[in-house]
C-alpha cells in the first residue's frame, strides 16, 4: 500500500493478492488481506473526507464485470467470499467511481495474455477506483485506457483505469468535446 495526499485528496494505491485457487492457503491469505484493509480503512480514514482507494483488487464485484460469468464460475476473482469482502470494503462509504459513469457490461481492465483474449474482449474488471462521497461528486468522468494495453511488447495484462476529479466550480469542458479528447490532449496528440 502506498498513500499520499494530493491537492487535498488522500490517494491510497493497493495491490490485492491474486488468491490463485479458491480454498487454497493463497485464497485464505487474500481474504485476510481484505479484512486487514477494511480494518485499516476504518481506523485511518474518514468516509466524509476526500479519499481514493484504487488499484488491482483482483475482484470482479458483479457478473457484468466478467466476459462470461459461467466460464469463470467457481474461480478466483468472482467467488462469493471475494465479492463479499469487496462489498464490506465499500459499505463503509466507498463508491465505484468507474461504474458510476459506466453502468454497461463489457468494459474490462484485465485480459489474459493467451488466446487473443484482449482482442476478443474476454476480460474482467478487477482494477478499481473506490472513492468517498466528496470525491464522487467531483468525479466528472472515468475511462479504461485500452490504448495503453495495445502494441508490442504488451506492457501489462491490465489497462489503466482513469478518473478525472475536477475542482469545484470548474466546468468539465475546458475546450474538449469528450473524455477521449481530454485523454488525447493529455498525451499531446489529436483526438
Where would I find each of the regions flagged by the language model?
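Hydrophobic/aromatic beta-strand patches that form the interior of the parallel beta-sheet core
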Residues: 12-14, 52, 98
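Metal-dependent phosphoester-hydrolase catalytic domains
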Residues: 63-191
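Catalytic metal-binding/acid-base residues of hydrolase active sites
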Residues: 17, 58-60, 102-103
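Acidic/histidine-rich, metal-coordinating catalytic segments
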Residues: 49-63
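A long, amphipathic alpha-helix that forms part
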Residues: 27-48
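Structured beta-strand-rich core segments of catalytic domains in phosphoester-bond hydrolases
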Residues: 1-21
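Surface-exposed cleft-lining segments at the edges of enzyme active sites
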Residues: 17-34, 70-75
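Glycine/proline-rich loop-helix segments at beta-alpha junctions forming the active-site rim
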Residues: 39, 43-44, 55-57, 149
Amino acid at each position: 500500500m502506498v498513500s499520499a495526499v494530493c491537492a487535498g485528496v488522500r490517494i491510497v494505491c493497493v495491490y490485492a493478492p491474486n488468491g490463485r485457487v479458491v480454498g487454497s492457503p493463497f485464497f485464505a491469505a487474500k481474504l485476510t488481506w481484505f479484512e486487514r484493509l477494511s480494518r485499516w480503512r476504518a481506523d485511518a480514514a474518514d468516509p466524509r473526507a476526500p479519499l481514493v482507494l484504487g488499484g488491482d483488487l483482483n475482484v470482479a464485484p458483479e457478473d457484468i464485470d466478467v466476459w462470461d460469468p459461467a466460464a469463470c464460475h467457481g474461480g478466483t476473482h468472482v467467488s462469493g467470499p471475494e465479492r463479499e469482502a469487496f462489498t464490506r470494503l465499500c459499505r463503509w462509504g466507498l463508491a465505484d467511481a468507474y461504474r458510476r459513469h459506466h453502468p454497461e457490461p463489457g468494459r474490462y481492465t484485465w485480459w489474459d495474455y493467451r488466446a487473443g483474449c484482449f482482442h476478443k474482449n474476454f476480460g474482467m474488471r478487477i482494477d478499481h477506483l473506490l472513492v468517498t462521497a466528496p470525491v464522487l461528486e467531483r468525479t466528472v468522468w472515468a475511462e479504461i485506457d485500452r490504448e495503453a494495453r495495445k502494441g508490442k511488447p504488451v506492457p501489462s495484462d491490465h489497462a489503466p483505469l482513469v478518473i478525472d476529479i475536477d475542482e469545484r466550480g470548474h466546468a468539465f469542458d475546458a475546450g474538449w468535446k469528450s473524455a477521449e479528447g481530454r485523454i488525447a490532449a493529455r498525451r499531446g496528440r489529436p483526438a
